[in-house]
Amino acid sequence: PHLGASTAEAQVAVAEEASQQVLDILDGRPARYAVNAPLLTPETARAIAPYLPLAEILGRFFAQYSRGGVRTLTLEVAGELATHDATPLQAAVLRGLLHDASNERVNLVNAATLAKSRGITVVERRTPDAGAFSTLVTISGTGADGAVRTVAGTLANGEPRFVRLDDYWLDV
């Protein structure tokens, strides 16, 4: 929003727009004009947006499945999304991972910072080959029990779908 609004009406419009952006961020939607959030091309934003809920769900599941204590998390984006910036997907995974483990409200803007402060490192990989899927989002890491865990998902008719749990392929 333009911060130099010179009329009362313009100031109200700027305040409303800024407030709506804050609400969007707090609700987990991507920031449109944030200074401290990655700037995405409209094409990337359109491509990535449908996968943000999937990434967050995978992160939430992974936090429980790995029994916490994850220090290094690998995010692999395969298929059609591999050509796009995966930073928002990474943020959504971290938002899910930290959702129940943080006293702070975790959103797409602060998720990476909160993860870093907890000693969590994210390794990102992109590959054009998603096997039988057009796009596959996979996260893996070592939990507190020392076991390496892997979960993967995709979208089926626009809905998040779990398709892999460790070495098992499934359709949930």
Residue ranges and their predicted role:
Residues 3-172:
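NAD(P)-dependent dehydrogenase/reductase Rossmann-like domain
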